[in-house]
Swiss-Prot record:
Modifications the protein undergoes after translation, according to the UniProt entry: Sumoylated by SIZ1.
Compositional bias annotation for Low complexity: 451-487
Gene name tied to this protein: GTE5
Occurrences of domain Bromo (ranges): 127-233
Domain named NET: residues: 320-401
Transit peptide region: 1-32
Key words of the record: Bromodomain, Chloroplast, Plastid, Transcription, Transcription regulation, Transit peptide, Ubl conjugation
Descriptive protein name: Transcription factor GTE5, chloroplastic
Length: 487
């Protein structure tokens, strides 16, 4: 009688069997004792070549679980011995990396290379790009299923159609079927290459066929359809690559400090001409014609400070307009002024402002018509382009006002700053602004001033005539009184 421990199905039982002396334990079918023995790496043969080992495959289903456990224990013990030997030779080496070099885990190396260590692994790692290519495939499928796309789904058979001059005009033939094949084989490095081939297909048809031809009209229709659908895919691609831009920009912080000292001295040079008297003489010729064409009648000395302010601000604005050449950052005052000017623009000019902003922010085209603008979030080039647009509009507006006799916009601003609550009355060519204190500043043309002078002289003569008349009446009255007293 002998006992055997049998395990299976999660439970263990002890059974007694009768065995004769001649009987042996049943062996697994198909696997001999020699086949079960696996050569293990030991200290004596760890550096032997693979030819010295007899690598045999073991079917785990043909042996018992107890033998599997024993086999695992032996393999683990041998593996620990190999790792200890590797650490003795190279203590700083990584055990996993050293074992990969020694050939012990040669099977794992095959698995790594077999899972797509080439293009598939790199292409699959970028999930965003894979999704974009899927969107490209769906867009191409819609184009090919269109009722007018049958002409472009296959290459042009120039010989069969008798188009002998086709290849002379069309240098690079392309069709949607070829694009589909290249997209399926992952031959496009980026979605932009896919878009170029689709455009090339329709542009070739537009180039070869005359205007009004059916193929010409089909090509225009499908090209417009593609461009409408491509906008969203292109935005996804731009947003995906924009996320990785900060990692590239981190490599360039070193040159920034060297550029900063060059930009900082510029603001220090700009305010210097305002306090000193010698620098202002060059700019006055620009503002001098404006002052010569306007004659100011000042009733009090309170209005005198208005004139130097208009003269001083002229060179500052000239320097500000020259500043964008250096692409410097706008100052806080310039940003505040730009924000105010943008709010004061008429509705027809806001469309141009939106187009300027969309150049650096293409994703705004997919949003609502209402755009919330943050001046600080815009880049330098966009800010300067907006600044030049606003200043150009103001200059054109001031020229129109001068042509109609309303004076320059800068003069109007300086007068507006010196008067708290102006009330404007316009009659003919004379404009008067009345302050709270009742003082008035009048602006008139030279011809009007001459008329005023002639009017004042006539009023003076009339006053003298009235004076003479009054003197005659006084003399008559005095003579009358004398005669009465005599009587």
């Amino acid at each position: 009688m002998s006992s055997e421990h049998i395990s299976g199905g999660g439970a263990s039982k002890t059974k007694k069997h009768k065995w004769s002396s001649s009987q042996n334990r049943p062996k697994p079918m198909g696997v001999s004792r020699q086949e079960r023995s696996v050569p293990l790496v030991s200290p004596s043969n760890s550096f032997a070549s693979e030819d010295d080992h007899h690598m045999l495959k073991i079917s785990l289903s043909s042996i018992s679980k107890l033998e599997v456990r024993n086999l695992k224990r032996k393999l683990k013990s041998e593996l620990d011995e190999v790792r200890s030997l590797i650490k003795r030779f190279d203590p700083e080496a990584n055990p996993g990396g050293s074992m990969a070099k020694s050939g012990v885990v040669g099977r794992s190396k095959k698995v790594k290379t077999g899972n797509g260590g080439g293009k598939k692994s790199g292409h699959g790692a970028d999930k965003g790009t894979v999704q974009i290519f899927k969107n490209c495939n769906s867009l191409l499928t819609k184009l090919m299923k269109h009722k007018s796309a049958w002409v472009f789904n296959v290459p042009v058979d120039a010989k069969g159609l008798g188009l002998h001059d086709y290849h002379n005009i069309v240098k690079e033939p392309m069709d949607l079927g070829t694009v589909k094949t290249k997209l399926g084989k992952s031959l496009y490095k980026s979605p932009l290459d896919f878009a170029e081939d689709v455009r090339l297909t329709f542009n070739n048809a537009i180039l070869y066929n005359p205007i009004g031809h059916d193929v010409y009209r089909f090509a225009e229709l499908l090209l417009n359809m593609f461009e409408d659908k491509w906008v969203s895919i292109e935005m996804q691609y731009d947003n995906l690559h924009r996320k990785f831009k900060p990692t590239r920009d981190i490599e360039f912080p070193a040159p920034a400090p060297s550029i900063a000292p060059i930009v900082e001295p510029l603001p220090a040079i700009v305010p210097s001409p305002s306090p000193s008297s010698p620098p202002p003489p060059p700019p006055p010729p620009v503002a001098a014609p404006v002052l010569e064409n306007r004659t100011w009648e000042r009733e009090e000395s309170m209005t005198i400070p208005v004139e130097p302010e208009a003269v001083i601000t002229a060179p500052e604005k000239a320097e500000e307009e020259e500043a964008p050449v250096n692409n410097r950052d706008l100052t806080l005052e310039e940003k505040r002024r730009l924000s105010e000017e943008l709010q004061d623009l008429p509705y027809d000019k806001l469309e141009t402002v939106v187009q300027i902003i969309k150049k650096s922010n293409p994703e705004l085209s997919q949003k609502d018509d209402e755009i919330e603008l943050d001046i600080d979030s815009l880049d330098i080039n966009t800010l300067w382009e907006l600044y030049r647009f606003v200043t150009g509009y103001k200059e054109s507006l001031s020229k129109k006002n001068e042509a109609h006799g309303f004076g320059s916009e800068r003069d109007a601003e300086s007068v507006h700053n010196s008067i708290q609550e102006p009330t404007t009355l316009v009659s003919g060519t004379t404009t008067s602004r009345v302050t709270e204190s009742g003082k008035a500043i009048r602006t008139s043309s030279p011809a009007r001033q001459e008329n005023n002078a002639s009017g004042s002289s006539s009023s003076n003569s009339s006053s003298s005539d009235s004076g003479s008349c009054s003197s005659d009446t006084d003399s008559d009255s005095s003579s009358g009184r004398g005669s009465d007293n005599g009587n």
